[in-house]
Amino acid sequence: MGKSLIQQRRGKGTTTFRAPSHRYRGAVRYVPLNLTKEKTLVGKVVEILHDPGRTAPVARVKFENGMEKLIIAPEGILVGEEIAIGPNAPIKIGNTLPLAMIPEGSYVYDIEGTPGDGGKYVRAGGVYALVVSREKDKVIVQLPSGELKQFNPMCRATIGVVAGGGRLEKPIVKAGKAYYIAKARNRFWPKPRGVKMNAVNHPHGGKEHHIGRPSTVSRRAPPGRKVGHIAARRTGRRK
């Protein structure tokens, strides 16, 4: 009898494949929309923290109404600095406003997909989006991928660039460092290829380290066989 594939083990949901969210700092969401719809909420940065579950640092902010929230830290923010959230907040790094109030050409991040959802887009370390144009019923923003996306003018965004942009500049150099990067998020690492396994472990294993049969497989194949090009219309180079 063959062994379970990696995706079969992952689907079982054991702790080997489960995210260690108990080690994460917590959810990063904007304050509820009803608190800042008409007035500006001001808060002070209490501390800047490393979050194992993110590529960007997070800042803990204490607001004037006593509420504490985690925000994604922008480049250049300092402990003790004040930030503001609301439609009348000044145009300043770290402040959060509706896209309708942000000038064209501004760098923004942590953009809401729909008004009040707390922030969905552009949250990774070192990234930013560009406000390209504003119209009455939509705001066009260029995402880090280069895609031009339309947003509701009432969707909120934070001005600035996400901190942690230099994390990819230093080379990993050795496997030990890659191991700890994966371990922080409980990633399954290293992940061996099927052709390097024994035949008992994988349909592509055994023989002379090549698949030895077509790599295409039916959409209705059983879980232990469903590897390779699943229900592929075509394979190989386009000629």
UniProtKB/Swiss-Prot annotation:
GO biological process: cytoplasmic translation
KW rRNA-binding (keyword) present: yes
A Pfam match: Ribosomal_L2_C
Keywords associated with the record: Ribonucleoprotein, Ribosomal protein, RNA-binding, rRNA-binding
Annotated Basic residues bias: 222-239
Keyword Translocase included in the entry's annotation: no
Stretch list, region Disordered: 200-239
GO molecular function: rRNA binding; structural constituent of ribosome
Cellular component GO terms held in the UniProt record: cytosolic large ribosomal subunit
Subunit note: Part of the 50S ribosomal subunit. Forms a bridge to the 30S subunit in the 70S ribosome.
Family matches, as NCBIfam families: PRK09612.1
Similarity remark: Belongs to the universal ribosomal protein uL2 family.
Stated role: One of the primary rRNA binding proteins. Required for association of the 30S and 50S subunits to form the 70S ribosome, for tRNA binding and peptide bond formation. It has been suggested to have peptidyltransferase activity; this is somewhat controversial. Makes several contacts with the 16S rRNA in the 70S ribosome.
Protein name: Large ribosomal subunit protein uL2
Protein source organism: Thermococcus onnurineus (strain NA1)
Gene behind the chain: rpl2
